[in-house]
C-alpha cells in the first residue's frame, strides 16, 4: 500500500531505476544459480518427484520475485525499504533521491527490522 504520492524528478527516476535494476538482476542471478543446483540433483527418471518439486519451487520463486520487484512509483519507497532491510541495496544506492524519500525508506525499513526482531 502506498504511503503517499511522491513526485519523482528525472534524476530521481534514473537513480531509482539503477538501484532497482541492480537488485533485480542480482535476485535473478541468485535464482538461476539455485535452479542449476537443483537441476544437477535430478539424476534420472526415478527422480520424477524431484522434477515436479522443482516446478513448484520455480513457480513460487517467480511469484516471490514478481511480488518483491514492483516498479510503480507509488510503491517504490516500500520496495526500496524491503530491499534495504534484506541487504539487496545499500543507502548509497539511493543517493540522488530527495531526502524525504530516503527518510521514508529508512522509516519503513526500520519497521521491517522491528517486526523481524519480534519474530526472533
Give the predicted meaning of each segment:
Residues 1-120:
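Acidic, Ser/Pro/Thr-rich low-complexity regulatory regions
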Amino acid at each position: 500500500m502506498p504511503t503517499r504520492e511522491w513526485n519523482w524528478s528525472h534524476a530521481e527516476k534514473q537513480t531509482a531505476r539503477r538501484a532497482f535494476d541492480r537488485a533485480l538482476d542480482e535476485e535473478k542471478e541468485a535464482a538461476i544459480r539455485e535452479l542449476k543446483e537443483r537441476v544437477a540433483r535430478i539424476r534420472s527418471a526415478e527422480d520424477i518427484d524431484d522434477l515436479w518439486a522443482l516446478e513448484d519451487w520455480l513457480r513460487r520463486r517467480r511469484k516471490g520475485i514478481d511480488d518483491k520487484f514492483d516498479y510503480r512509483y507509488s510503491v517504490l519507497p516500500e520496495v526500496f525499504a524491503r530491499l534495504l532491510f534484506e541487504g539487496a541495496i545499500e543507502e548509497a544506492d539511493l543517493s540522488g533521491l530527495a531526502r524525504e524519500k530516503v527518510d521514508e525508506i529508512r522509516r519503513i525499513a526500520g519497521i521491517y527490522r522491528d517486526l523481524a526482531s519480534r519474530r526472533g
